[in-house]
């Protein structure tokens, strides 16, 4: 079972309640589309939230004898896991992930990696731009200068996809998992005129590999909405906030 939800911003009650109510007839892969809020204060607050989540998934196992993994896409209001000493890199589902030994079921999917889970193929493109970064800096709120993927990181991601495409390596029916949407898709859901490198590079991904991408799932916008796009790219866009959507 693959389930998607949106930003948590440190409030774990919604996701814990979902895990507790789930009957657990099959393994659960629970995707959080950014800003989970567990790598935010980088201290005791984060630790308590991680303990709550890990406890919930362990109780899920004890009750159902089925596994529950919380798969996290990086947002723009959280520290990169690779910059936190307690995370180690592992290979899962065909791609690289970041995991802490204390919380083995809280798994950050590395940006730019391809994953195959229960027959579906995913491309992960995390991060985003904080339009409120100046006020966040002034008020000593969480802001990270590497919230967006760098130009070099984007070049590497696009290069890897080009290589796979040229070699015909099963780059079909991709579902992109992200925090924000490409510029061409975001304008349908928001009136914000300011754009970012992330949104523009995502548009480049669509232009180059749109024929391989069947759907794009995101968070960030604090709405639950879906739409079939048809203008420049024909595919399905879903935005998650406080819902739980099962694939």
Model-derived regions: residue spans:
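Generic hydrophobic alpha-helical membrane-span motif
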Residues: 13, 41, 81, 125, ...
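Catalytic metal-binding/acid-base residues of hydrolase active sites
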Residues: 8-9, 36-37, 76-80, 128-129, ...
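Conserved beta-strand segments of alpha/beta enzyme cores
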Residues: 69, 105-107, 121, 215, ...
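Binuclear metal-dependent phosphoesterase catalytic core
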Residues: 116-118, 204-211, 222-247
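Conserved acidic residues
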Residues: 28-30, 173-174, 214
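Extreme N-terminal starter segment of soluble prokaryotic enzymes
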Residues: 1-3
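Core catalytic region of metal-dependent phosphoesterases/phosphodiesterases
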Residues: 5, 10-117, 190-203, 208-209, ...
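Active-site-proximal loop/helix segment associated with metal-binding centers of metalloenzymes
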Residues: 95-98, 117-196
């Amino acid at each position: 079972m693959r389930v998607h939800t949106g930003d948590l911003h440190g409030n774990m009650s919604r996701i814990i309640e979902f895990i507790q109510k789930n009957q657990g007839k099959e393994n659960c892969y629970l995707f959080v589309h950014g800003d989970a809020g567990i790598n935010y204060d980088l201290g005791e607050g984060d630790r308590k939230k991680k303990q709550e989540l890990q406890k919930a998934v362990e109780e899920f196992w004890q009750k159902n004898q089925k596994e529950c993994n919380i798969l996290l896409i990086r947002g723009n209001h959280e520290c990169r896991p690779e910059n936190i000493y307690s995370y180690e890199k592992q290979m899962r589902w065909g791609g690289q992930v970041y995991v802490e030994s204390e919380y083995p079921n809280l798994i950050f999917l590395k940006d730019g990696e391809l994953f195959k889970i229960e027959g579906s193929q995913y491309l992960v493109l995390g991060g985003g731009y904080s339009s409120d970064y100046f006020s966040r800096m002034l008020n000593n709120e969480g802001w990270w200068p590497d919230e967006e993927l760098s130009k070099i990181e984007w070049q590497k991601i696009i290069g890897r996809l080009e290589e796979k495409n040229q070699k015909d390596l099963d780059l079909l029916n991709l579902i992109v998992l992200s925090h924000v949407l490409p510029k061409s898709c975001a304008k349908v859901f928001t009136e914000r005129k300011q754009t970012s490198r992330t949104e523009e590079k995502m548009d480049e991904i669509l232009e180059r590999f749109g024929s391989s991408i069947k759907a794009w799932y995101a968070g960030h916008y604090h709405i639950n909405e879906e739409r079939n796009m048809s203008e420049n790219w024909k595919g399905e866009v879903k935005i998650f906030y406080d819902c739980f959507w099962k694939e």
